[in-house]
Amino acid sequence: MSAGSTPKPSPLVEGIFRREILPWGLLGLTLGLVEGATAAILVKQHFAGAASSFGVNIAVALVSGAPAFSNVLSFVWANVAHGRARVQLMVALQAAFALLVGCVALASRASAGLAVTVLSIIAARVVWAGILTVRAAVWTANYPRHVLARITGRIVIVNAIAVATSAALVGGALQGRVIDARWLYGGGAIAGLSGAWLYRAMRVRREFQLLAAEAAHGGKSEPFSLRMLTQILKEDPAYREYMLWMGVFGAGNLMLTAQLVLLFSEQLHLTSGVQIGLLAVVPLLTQPLFMPAWSRLFDGSHVVRYRSRQGWALVLASLTLCLGVFTRSLTLLWLGAVLLGAAQAGANLGWNLGHNDFASLGRAQHYMGVHVTLTGLRGGVAPPLGVLAYMGLERWHAGSGEWALLLPLAMTVAGALGFNRMRVALER
């Protein structure tokens, strides 16, 4: 290999990748039905008039934040997975996830059906949080660090395309009203169960070493818990600061999505198809175009340096979307959707893999547990606060709710500045 050339994955690594690409693609079809923006638009459009406006808006906030909020119980999943064979556990979680998504198809169009829908989506996302926690350890074991982002980036690309496909189908069903959009959730359950069945062929490299390393760090005698979470943050000041700025940065992003769903529906009066196109389909389809560039940047630097660059991409996307709302410009909104996809491609990569630059062997799952648990806390708080800020301004003066967008924009800027502060300290 010549100096400066990019190392290629070994045939063994490529073989492992081929085994898991199709299962994750099928599960992506299921996941797309409970992604934050898609689920929020479904709730807003399908249950409008079937429940109180306040109840529907709070439900929008809950399902919008569900992908993040559900992670608050990740320490339980880290404890369940610690010291256990990963593939069998993963298959069980994937099957449970698919069945919970299918429950949405059974919900009636009434207040009770709204409750069933919200609870099913949150429960499905709780199980998906377990899948992400276990998958982090599998990927770390199977793929060397110098190719980790490129290999997993391919999986994320396939997953994003599948999620976008599901989102587009929901948007078409809501707008065309040819079929009930909830029927798609039954099909999503079948796709997810098929993915779980295929994942049984997956293997974990040197799993005995992984289990031994976990046992050396306490094994079942020291399960992951809130006490361990606080201990890790106390003992690792660099990771603690990284989590602080991730919290500010991520909360702004989560708050923005919930507010945009309400603004698009209540003030801009966009159709369901356009809303899902702006908040789900276009960002998801844009991600694969930018993933290779973000992957190369991640593989060649520490996550702090990476975030100090990637953070500004999300700031630019958020600013463009806000300007699109303020000026009622569809052109700016579509541009913002493209920029959002570009930024999310990098954000997803850093979210899934960034903790590895702080954790030692055998502790990656615990560090990921800290990360996703804190993600859950902001997911449960930020979207409802954003929605309440919007409704409060609307109650004070009709039409002024759009100014609530300044809150998530300011938080995203603050987070990006925090990552740059860490980068400067790291390079001293």
Predicted regions and their residues:
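Helix-to-loop junctions at the C-terminal end of transmembrane segments
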Residues: 72-86, 174, 289-303, 390
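A membrane-interface helix-boundary motif in multi-pass transporters
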Residues: 172-190, 390-412
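Intracellular juxtamembrane helix-capping segments at the cytosolic ends
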Residues: 130-143, 346-360
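Cytoplasmic membrane-interface "Motif A"-like loop-to-helix N-cap segments
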Residues: 82-95, 299-314
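Multi-pass alpha-helical transporter architecture, strongest
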Residues: 10, 23, 105-108, 191-203, ...
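Helix-loop boundary and gating motifs at the non-cytosolic
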Residues: 2-72, 238-280
